[in-house]
């Protein structure tokens, strides 16, 4: 064993960490690499991300740790909000600034024309995923076909564009604009930018993309990997939001000690076992608390007059 190996500080053991890290992902880092680095910095036993963010995009990447991973699917299904910078008049091989320009056309539209084109993409639309994406065909990611110079048929997918707001527009002086897009899961902003360019007759590609919200989670309070690294090891878990930050839309229900014991055994609770002032409506998913001080026990849904556990957490 070398002297350097002998002098290396011992690796600290993994630990139980529960909560949601609101990570501001940097440019050029994949979501998986960001997760690996955050998990190492926190020394967490269990972690998972809530949907990928392209390496060329920055912004909000919620990472779930410990018991929060039980709710990661909810964020996968949540609406997303992005800010995107679009360059008109040029199409690239990848739909973004990393690709080669393959088509160049004059840009003759003004702000009114841009607004009219954007309006065509509001609501439910059919969108063909880009070749440079991680979607798979015959077990292979589409980007592998694209890198080999192949184009394969991709079925259009139905997505919903809830809102598009133009934040900045250089037209007609310069061929670019910035938009904020709120959309359903599975929406490709790169493709949306290209489609807007086609609607204007000039083509387009993305030059910048930043995610600013996932469901109710925003960049407010988000941290970078460098900020985590700068903290003392024992202070890092405090940088996570609590597990119930993922459940803000669910009304709270607090149980008595007796009801809590039954709930944690997976038993349903009759309406009479609940505080009538906080009992949820039929069909509503609630976040359930118990103990002193109250802590999150899980989520449950009111069905046929009884509160039925759906997911339990052990904090």
Swiss-Prot record:
This is tRNA pseudouridine synthase B. Its EC number is 5.4.99.25. GO terms for biological process: mRNA pseudouridine synthesis; tRNA pseudouridine synthesis. Belongs to the pseudouridine synthase TruB family. Type 1 subfamily. InterPro entries: PsdUridine_synth_cat_dom_sf, PsdUridine_synth_N, PUA-like_sf, PUA_sf, tRNA_psdUridine_synth_TruB, tRNA_sdUridine_synth_fam1_C, TruB_C. One of its GO terms (molecular function) is tRNA pseudouridine(55) synthase activity. CDD domains: PseudoU_synth_EcTruB (cd02573), PUA_TruB_bacterial (cd21152). The keyword tRNA processing applies. It comes from Cupriavidus pinatubonensis (strain JMP 134 / LMG 1197) (Cupriavidus necator (strain JMP 134)). It comes from the Bacteria. It catalyses: uridine(55) in tRNA = pseudouridine(55) in tRNA. Keywords: Isomerase, tRNA processing.
């Amino acid at each position: 064993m070398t002297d350097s190996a002998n002098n290396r500080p011992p690796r600290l053991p993994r630990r139980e960490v529960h909560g949601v890290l609101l990570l501001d992902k940097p440019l050029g880092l994949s979501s998986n690499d960001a997760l690996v680095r955050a998990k190492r910095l926190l020394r967490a036993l269990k972690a998972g991300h809530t949907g990928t963010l392209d390496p060329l995009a920055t912004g909000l990447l919620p990472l779930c740790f410990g018991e929060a991973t039980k709710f990661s699917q909810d964020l996968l299904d949540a609406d997303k909000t992005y800010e995107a910078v679009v360059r008109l008049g040029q199409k690239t091989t990848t739909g973004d600034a990393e690709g080669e320009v393959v088509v160049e056309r004059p840009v003759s539209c003004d702000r009114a024309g841009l607004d009219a084109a954007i309006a065509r993409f509001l609501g439910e639309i059919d969108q063909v995923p880009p070749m440079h994406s991680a979607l798979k065909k015959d077990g292979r990611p589409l980007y592998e076909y694209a890198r080999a110079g192949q184009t394969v048929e991709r079925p259009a997918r139905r997505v919903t564009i809830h809102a598009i707001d133009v934040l900045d527009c250089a037209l007609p002086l310069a061929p670019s604009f910035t938009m904020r897009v709120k959309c359903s899961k599975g929406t490709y902003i790169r493709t949306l930018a290209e489609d807007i360019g086609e609607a204007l007759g000039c083509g387009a590609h993305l030059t910048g993309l930043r995610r600013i919200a996932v469901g109710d989670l925003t960049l407010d309070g988000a941290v970078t990997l460098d900020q985590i690294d700068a903290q003392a090891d024992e202070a890092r878990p405090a940088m996570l939001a609590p597990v119930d930050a993922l459940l803000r839309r669910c009304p709270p229900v607090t149980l008595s000690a007796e009801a809590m014991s039954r709930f944690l055994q997976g038993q349903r609770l009759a309406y009479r076992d609940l505080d009538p002032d906080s009992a949820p409506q039929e069909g509503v998913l609630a976040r359930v608390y118990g103990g002193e001080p109250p802590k999150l026990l899980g989520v449950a849904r009111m069905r046929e007059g009884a509160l039925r556990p759906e997911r339990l957490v052990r904090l």
